């Protein structure tokens, strides 16, 4: 796990068993096709609601508690352990050639995550926008099994996918409960 230099963006690799659980959960969500209700102007074409497996929830919440002093120091929210962290909802994204995700943020949560299930080489990059500057995160085949975690008020976007093949990712919002 590491923070991208000079940012609050954490990159971490999921344990193999957690990644396998996420692959299975995303396959079920894609099969069930329960539409995730993102605004049409911000959404890619294929987004489906899904339930994250307990193994993933336990892992990511513990990781956030250990890695981010953000909520403890910057906002004076005193939490010890994961009991106050909660994934409010999650969804699977399926990107095809030409798809993109317009700049947006997640106002009703504290953290956001995007974990990569299946990618192609030279896939559409993920960008963070701050002070009219972009921080690019390249996504490629080696991104599979990795997750980006960051404060949800950071504006982010996915550029148009120019490669053939699908990119499957799972996204979600995390809140801190009182």
Labelled PLM ranges:
Residues 167-178:
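Short peripheral tails and domain-boundary helices/loops at the edges of structured domains
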Residues 84-153, 157-159, 165-169:
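Catalytic core of non-heme Fe(II) oxygenases with the double-stranded beta-helix
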Residues 41-57, 64, 93, 113-121, ...:
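Generic ordered-secondary-structure signal
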């Amino acid at each position: 796990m590491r923070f991208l230099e000079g940012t609050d963006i954490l990159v971490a690799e999921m344990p193999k068993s957690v990644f396998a659980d996420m692959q299975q959960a995303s396959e079920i969500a894609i099969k069930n096709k329960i539409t995730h209700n993102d605004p049409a102007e911000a959404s890619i074409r294929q987004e489906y609601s899904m339930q994250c497996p307990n193994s993933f929830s336990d892992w990511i919440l513990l990781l956030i508690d250990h890695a981010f002093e953000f909520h403890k120091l910057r906002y004076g929210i005193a939490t010890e352990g994961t009991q106050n962290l909660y994934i409010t909802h999650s969804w699977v994204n399926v990107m095809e050639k030409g798809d993109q995700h317009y700049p947006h943020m997640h106002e009703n949560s504290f953290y956001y995550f995007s974990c990569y299930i299946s990618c192609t080489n030279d896939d559409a990059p993920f960008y963070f926008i701050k002070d009219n500057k972009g921080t690019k995160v390249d996504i490629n085949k080696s991104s599979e099994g990795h997750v980006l975690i960051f404060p949800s008020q950071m504006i982010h976007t996915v550029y148009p996918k120019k490669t053939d093949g699908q990119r499957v990712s799972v996204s979600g919002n995390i809140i801190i409960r009182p």
